[in-house]
A protein has these predicted regions:
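Acyltransferase
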Residues: 71-107
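Hydrophobic alpha-helical scaffolding
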Residues: 8-11, 30, 77, 81
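Cysteine-nucleophile active-site neighborhood
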Residues: 1-27
């Protein structure tokens, strides 16, 4: 597949609930900023990524997640974009840059 690891049905909810995500290395978010999200899925991966730290606000429990690099940000969390508009701005900017660099011209 496109990513390392495998994905498997677990038969129950995995990492269910609200979280806040912080990038370990600023890529889509400015340094020290977070974005809110939630997770509710029945599948799990053998490689959930380690480029972000997810923290449950209610308990403080945290875990690694998300596979991120220059122009992609992949993972199970469902992001709440209004909680940090910088993320959406970065996403659009990176998509624009990718398209420009891929084709060598703007459309």
């Amino acid at each position: 597949g496109a990513l390392d690891g495998g994905c498997h049905f677990k038969g129950k909810l995995v990492r269910f609930g609200y979280i806040e995500l912080a990038e370990k290395h600023s890529n889509f978010l400015p340094p020290n900023e977070k974005i809110k999200a939630h997770e509710f899925h029945y599948y799990d991966s053998t490689d959930n990524g380690a480029d972000c730290i997810a923290t449950k606000p209610a308990t403080g429990r945290s875990y690694d997640c998300v596979i991120s690099h220059d122009n992609y940000w992949l993972g199970f969390p469902h992001l709440y974009y209004p909680s940090n508009p910088h993320f959406a701005e970065s996403f659009v900017r990176k998509a624009y840059e990718y398209r420009r660099n891929k084709n060598g011209k703007l459309l």
